[in-house]
């Protein structure tokens, strides 16, 4: 049985990973999360009673607390997901992204290195530090049919993606300089259950159900590759346990869609699954409203995920159609979860860009 320390484990992707490990493997999990607005213990409720689950409310920028967590829990692997991750908020307030994504990653690397150096030789060789990153570090695929590969040069275009690119470089440097056994994954856009409603898909679902406008940036022609979060969780565990030290693996869903098409798909599913519309709404798609585009908005992201398929045998199980149906059904069936999120600090806006 491995013990896996997961930073950001109360977040969207992190909680999906925790639920997967507890439900589908025999490994134990220690979640480290400072519970910012996007961290939600309700997302961990399905597994919180497991004897293989532990939770530490700790900021990854707190070196002393991290040292305590490593000493007390003695993990065999670190999976680092703690990050500020919303592009709009990074434009409005980049400082938190620099602090968490760069300084926090540095602090975690140093805590992990000190712990790793004190391990026995067999435990040192088995230890892994898996850093979870984004395809946004590669920049934009404007006017091409190319795909991001593991060797695509970095060209981040937002404060968020620049901070994640910085953290990727730190992780690689800690392997080359100190020998810390690291791996990196870069993923495409995730969606699915327990997604915080500042992001496109849950925001559109909940706005439509409330009869609110569905804001689409620019002309809605921006293209993203969509990855169902439970497919991503399987991929992350696969890389952490079977990936090769020093390697980078791109994880994508093979589902490129224009943003406008995504919103229209949501509207079509709601017509079928939630036919009792809010007062005054004839068709959900009538709520679509085009708004001023995001500054520096990348036109296209698309991932070539052939390496992880070829070398580790991972493939996504959900198509965009099956994953979107599951996602809409989950939000319709779990009103209590998203109502409690909305009752907190978040009030159904695209956070950031306050002018």
Swiss-Prot record:
Cofactor: bound how, per the entry note? Binds 1 NAD(+) per subunit.
- What does the record give under GO molecular function? dTDP-glucose 4,6-dehydratase activity
Which cofactor does this sequence's record say it needs?
NAD(+)
Q: Which reaction does it catalyse?
A: dTDP-alpha-D-glucose = dTDP-4-dehydro-6-deoxy-alpha-D-glucose + H2O
Q: Which cysteines are joined by disulfide bonds?
A: none
**Binding of NAD(+), residues:** 12-13, 33-36, 59-60, 81-85, 100, 160-164, 190
UniProt EC number: 4.2.1.46
Q: Name one GO biological process term.
A: lipopolysaccharide biosynthetic process
Pathway of action: Nucleotide-sugar biosynthesis; dTDP-4-acetamido-4,6-dideoxygalactose biosynthesis; Bacterial outer membrane biogenesis; enterobacterial common antigen biosynthesis
* Keyword tags: Lyase, NAD
Q: Where do the annotations place substrate binding?
A: 85, 134, 189, 199-200, 215-217, 224, 259, 293-297
Where are the active-site residues found? 135-136, 160
Carries keyword NAD?
yes
Q: What class of enzyme is it?
A: lyase
Family (UniProt) = Belongs to the NAD(P)-dependent epimerase/dehydratase family. dTDP-glucose dehydratase subfamily.
Q: Tell me which NCBIfam families the record gives.
A: dTDP_gluc_dehyt, PRK10084.1, PRK10217.1
Q: How does it assemble?
A: Homodimer.
- Described purpose of this protein according to its UniProt entry: Catalyzes the dehydration of dTDP-D-glucose to form dTDP-6-deoxy-D-xylo-4-hexulose via a three-step process involving oxidation, dehydration and reduction.
Q: What is this protein called?
A: dTDP-glucose 4,6-dehydratase 2
